[in-house]
């Protein structure tokens, strides 16, 4: 049965209490087995769609700042030992890296949809990078 939207109604007064059936009364008085309420389970994909909408609304950075900063410094150490970064430079690198990754995942998703799939695979990412003209 389809769900319908319920609207508020005016109450016309107090109704007389009804007599409960014996089975309902027995059910209410019986103790709940275990006493632990099971957590609510959402259908597969519901939480994923909610997360997609949430992250599409926000403009903040998705990668944590300190781990990204450590990664940048680690990569820079391989090129030169004593290199310093302004905080704005690391933020600019992070913005650029996240913009690149978001675009790559969008193209990867289009490749998966083109192959009549909804799940992205490594071959989709390889195809997206190849079409873009990037090296492996």
Curated annotation (Swiss-Prot):
Task: Tell me if Kinase is a UniProt keyword of this record.
Answer: no
SUBUNIT field: The nucleosome is a histone octamer containing two molecules each of H2A, H2B, H3 and H4 assembled in one H3-H4 heterotetramer and two H2A-H2B heterodimers. The octamer wraps approximately 147 bp of DNA.
Q: Which family does it belong to?
A: Belongs to the histone H3 family.
Gene source species:
Tetrahymena pyriformis
Q: Mind listing the UniProt keywords for this protein, alphabetically?
A: Chromosome, DNA-binding, Nucleosome core, Nucleus
Family matches, as PROSITE patterns: HISTONE_H3_1 (PS00322), HISTONE_H3_2 (PS00959)
Q: What is the lineage of its organism?
A: Eukaryota, Sar, Alveolata, Ciliophora, Intramacronucleata
**Source superkingdom:** Eukaryota
Q: Name one GO molecular function term.
A: structural constituent of chromatin
Q: What is this protein called?
A: Histone H3.3
- CC terms in the record's Gene Ontology section: nucleosome; nucleus
- Say yes or no: keyword Protein transport present: no
